[in-house]
Every structure is written in C-alpha cells, then in structure tokens.
C-alpha cells in the first residue's frame, strides 16, 4: 500500500515546460500531442485510419465491393475532410458506413452526398443515447464538455490548449461551422451479429466502454478489428465532464473478448492503430490489467474500511504501466477513477462520519474560516501553501473563501476578487504539472472564470436550441419543462395545461405538489394553442409568451391562467 502523503501521479510540481505555442504543461502532455497530429495511417493492405482530423478517427476498410467508412466524426465538414484524404489513396466507391458508438456520428450526410442510399450499421442503442444528452440534463452536460475539452480556453500562452487527451481538440477549427449531419443507422444490432458488407465478412460484438452502445467490429478475412475499448491513454473510468458509471468489469470482458480474436491489426476510435499480433496482445493484456488493478484495489481498500480520501492515497498504478502510452494517465487520473469505482459500487457515503450530515454551503465555509482564526489567517495559509507548491491544501483553503458567500444567482461562489485569484493560482499550479488533459483543461477553464477572463454563466441555464427541439415531435419538448419547475412559485398549485399544436398533436402537463407530471387531457381546464414552430421559438428564447399572445400566434382558454401556469418554470421566455 502506498503511504505517501501526496499522490504524485496526479500532478508533479516542478515538472512544467513550455509548449510550442507558449503553453505551460507537463512534458508528457506536450509529447502526447505528437501522437495525435493529423496522419492517414495505412493499416495492412486494405485499411486506413485517419488520426487527428477531429477528436475521433475516421477509418476506412476496402472490400471487393467498395469502401466501408467507420465513424463520421462531429460534423459534415470533418467527414468531408476525411473523404478528401482517403480519395488520395483509393477511388473505391462507398459501400457502407458503420458507427462504433454514438459519440461520432455527426458527419454522415457528407457521405450521402456521394452515395444517397448508403447502408448504415450501428448499435440499436445509439438513438436513445443521443436523445439522453440533449434534454433534461443538457446544461450540466454542456458545461462538463466545456471544461473537459477546453472549449473556452485560449489557443496560445500559458493557459493555451495542448490537447484533450484523445485528440488535439474537441472540434477542429478548420471544420467550422460544424454542420450536424447525423443519419440514423438502418441496420442495427444489440447482440453478436454477422453480416456481409462490401463483399467482406463482418462480425459485430457489443462491447460497452465509455458508451453503452459501443461495438467491436471484426473483419476475419483481414485479421483486423476496429474498437472503442483500447485508447491512446489509460481508460477513463471517470470522465471529469460528468458521466454515468462505467463498470470496469464490463470493459474488461470486452477487452478479453477482443484479445481472443488474435488480430493482426487494431484500429481504435481514437489514436494511432496498432499492428502485429504480439504487440496487440501485450497492449490489450496490459490495458485490461491496469483497469482490473484499479477495480480490485478499490474493492480491497473498501472492504478494509478505508474512507475515500484514504483509498486515493493508497492506490497508484505500478511503475510497469508507465512503459506504454496506452496505460499512462494522459486523459484522466487514477485517483479520480478510484473515486468513481467506489461510488459506482457503494454510493456516495464512504463511512466517513463527516460526510453523513455535512454543514451546507456557504455556512460550512464560514464556520471553517472562523475556526481557522479568520480571513487573514486563511489567506496567509493559502499564500504559504502556494509558495511551497502545496496545491492540494491551497485549493482546499481558497475554496472556503470563494464559497463563503452566495452570488446573485444563489450559488456559493462569490468570494472576494483577491481570493478568487488565489484559487485560480492554485488551480493553475495543478494544471501546469499534470499529465492529465482532463485535469489540465478543467482546472484552467475554472481558473479563467475565477480571475474574470471568461464567463461561463450561459452554461448554467437551459438554452434550448430550436434545431435540436425540431428534430423530435413538439409534444416531447413539453415534458422537458419538468426539470425547470420552481417549487416556490408553484406553491400549492394543482392545475393541468393542455398544449395543442395546430399543425398536429397535443399534450397535457399537470403541476401538483411541486412537481410537473404528464397530465390527462380530460382534466385540463387551461389550454394553449399554437404552431409547433412558435412553441420551439418560445423554448429557445426567440419568442416570449406575452409576445406570442400579443401577436396572435398563440391562443389560450384564459391568458392569465396560462401565464400563471407557465410562470412556474425557470425559463425567461415563459415569464415575459
């Protein structure tokens, strides 16, 4: 068991160098970017993988009847660039498209411009996963993406983006305006499936990893596998952006099944391909072993009764796993993965008494400051910790000061500018000294907000996009209001509103006892009638309820009743 007071693998003060654009970062972080530069790799005689065109790879398998495209990236522009690259190598006609998982399906329309009836294959769960991230939890998901993938960070200077772990950027700036070209798969599977595609035998094996709909794709005639299991960095059991639990045991099964294929070539959803049975076998073995190590040791420590803060200090990967970049902490860090494994298995309570009924914020911070001897003593301790590169302690102390008062939006995040700067400095200390792209990007994004260089408030409110709402029936979007209900406004209201869409469809929503639930149209005493297009405009903040009523594009059974009902929701356009 490791008994060090610090967890050196998460960040190592004093290990900072300057990158090519003036970025301050760990040398391994800067070195990792070289693996992610745009390169079209030839994989055997019949396949190519384009790395560095975007966050993910676009890969191509040539069969007797044409070219199979695997993953289409974030947007049509990304896929169009990939097509241009592959056309330098082969003129084979497009024969099919396959999705490895739902993250990289946004550029498919670019393929249909070349072949309108292109067959598309993918897991049956892709659509549900896409829908899951676009509705109720959208602000939290978006904010997580902004932090993890450096979306608001500068491109140059000490705080400049180096990479995002699995790629050099979330979206390649050359691909603006990032046109969404997702097309659903028409050939789906949810279990092992065999097919003939482009004249090649193809086998699909569901293999959940960072997505429940991931699949390993095996081309037995080519001895080639395409996967989303083995990444160019230690697997992210925990994603700092916020994700559901990824059970390492499920991932390990997928890796073991993939290893049994005995591939000569291995293409990933991210990073350079691997070739040679021996190298692939060793990388696959070490990858699954690194993940099992984290799971096994977390369980061992939990069984012994250690709290989470003890467990993270007790578990570090053996030095052996630093031999190859695929098991290095270039994306996330072990101590965060350990926390996720523990909470995934046992929930948030780690048997530390202090966590059972903690004093809520901001009162907790106020009590800690008082107990420490007051603001000046806390500030002096922070400054001493910063001088000693003790960034863990500096962050904890500075967070007391920043979170000791509520801001105008009600969050405990209103500390004095000088204290926000102290916290920003401590976070930068971590960011410049970690191998983890996730940690660097999260810490710098927060530091830039703390010191006033950026404003992230727009990511803390629901900002519905009309084009996203319009992709589904209007009746579905009414249900999204559930998570915007303000109980203090609803009070003891028990009322049902029926929304009638003049171009087809209607839905009822009931407010009762502080919740909004699906309603029964027979119980609706209040009605709102309008075209779905105008409803989408209201949800997206392009049209207010009052303006819709004044312009006559919305009609009600009683204006005041509808206004009173919709005022209960935290959406400005429904309150004005």
Question: Predicted segment positions?
Answer:
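Conserved beta-strand hairpin/beta-sheet module of binuclear metal-dependent hydrolase folds
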Residues: 37-90, 215-229
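Accessory terminal helices/loops
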Residues: 2-30, 138-142, 151-159, 163-175, ...
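Short, hydrophobic/aromatic-rich segments at coil-to-beta transitions
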Residues: 43-49, 199-203, 491-498
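Divalent metal-coordination and catalytic microenvironments
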Residues: 46, 61, 71, 86, ...
């Amino acid at each position: 068991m490791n008994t060090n007071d610090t967890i050196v693998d998460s960040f190592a003060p004093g290990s900072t160098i300057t990158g090519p654009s003036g970025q301050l970062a760990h040398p391994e972080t800067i070195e990792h970017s070289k693996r992610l530069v745009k390169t079209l790799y030839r994989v055997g005689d019949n396949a190519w993988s384009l790395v560095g065109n975007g966050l993910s790879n676009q890969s191509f398998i040539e069969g007797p009847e044409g070219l199979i495209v695997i993953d289409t990236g974030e947007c049509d522009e990304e896929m169009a660039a990939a097509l241009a690259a592959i056309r330098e190598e082969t003129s084979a006609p497009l024969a099919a498209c396959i999705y490895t998982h739902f993250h990289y399906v946004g550029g498919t329309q670019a393929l249909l411009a070349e072949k309108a009836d292109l067959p598309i294959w993918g897991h049956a769960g892709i659509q549900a996963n896409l829908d899951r991230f676009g509705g109720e939890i959208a602000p939290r998901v978006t904010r997580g993406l902004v932090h993890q993938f450096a979306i608001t960070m500068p491109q140059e200077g000490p705080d400049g983006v180096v990479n995002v772990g699995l790629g050099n950027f979330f979206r390649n700036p050359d691909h603006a305006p990032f046109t969404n070209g997702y097309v659903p798969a028409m050939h789906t599977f949810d279990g092992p499936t065999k097919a003939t595609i482009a004249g090649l035998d193809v086998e699909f094996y569901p293999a959940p990893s960072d997505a429940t709909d991931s699949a390993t794709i095996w081309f037995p005639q080519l001895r080639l596998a395409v996967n989303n299991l083995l990444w160019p960095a230690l697997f992210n059991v925990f994603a700092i952006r916020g994700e559901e639990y990824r059970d390492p045991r499920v991932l390990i099964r997928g890796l073991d099944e993939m290893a049994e294929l005995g591939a000569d070539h291995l293409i990933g959803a991210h990073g350079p391909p691997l070739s040679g049975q021996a190298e692939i076998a060793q990388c696959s073995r070490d990858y699954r072993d690194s993940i099992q190590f984290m799971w096994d040791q977390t369980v061992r420590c939990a069984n012994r009764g250690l709290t989470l803060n003890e467990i993270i200090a007790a578990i570090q990967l053996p030095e052996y796993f630093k031999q190859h970049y695929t098991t290095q902490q270039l994306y996330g860090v072990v101590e965060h993965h350990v926390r996720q494994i523990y909470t995934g298995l046992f929930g948030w309570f780690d048997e530390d008494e202090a966590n059972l009924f903690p004093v809520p914020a901001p009162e907790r911070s106020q009590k800690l400051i008082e107990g420490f001897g007051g603001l000046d003593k806390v500030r002096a301790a922070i400054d001493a910790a910063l001088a000693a590169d003790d960034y863990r302690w500096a962050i904890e102390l500075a967070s007391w000061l920043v979170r000791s008062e509520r801001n105008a939006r009600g969050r405990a995040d209103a500390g004095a500018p000088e204290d926000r700067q102290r916290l920003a400095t401590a976070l930068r200390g971590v960011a410049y000294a970690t191998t983890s792209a996730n940690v660097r990007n999260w810490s710098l994004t927060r530091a830039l907000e703390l010191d006033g260089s950026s404003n992230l408030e727009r990511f803390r409110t629901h900002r519905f996009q009309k084009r996203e709402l319009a992709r589904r029936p209007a009746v579905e979007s009414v249900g999204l209001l559930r998570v915007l209900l303000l109980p203090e406004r609803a009070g003891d209201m028990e009322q049902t509103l029926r929304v009638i869409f003049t171009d087809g469809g209607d839905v009822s929503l009931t407010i009762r006892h502080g919740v909004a639930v699906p309603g029964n149209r027979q119980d609706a005493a209040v009605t709102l009638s309008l075209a779905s297009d105008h409803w989408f405009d209201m949800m997206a903040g392009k049209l207010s309820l009052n303006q819709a009523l004044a312009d006559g594009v919305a009609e009600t059974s009683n204006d005041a009743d509808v206004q009173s009902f919709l005022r209960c929701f935290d959406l400005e356009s429904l309150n004005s």
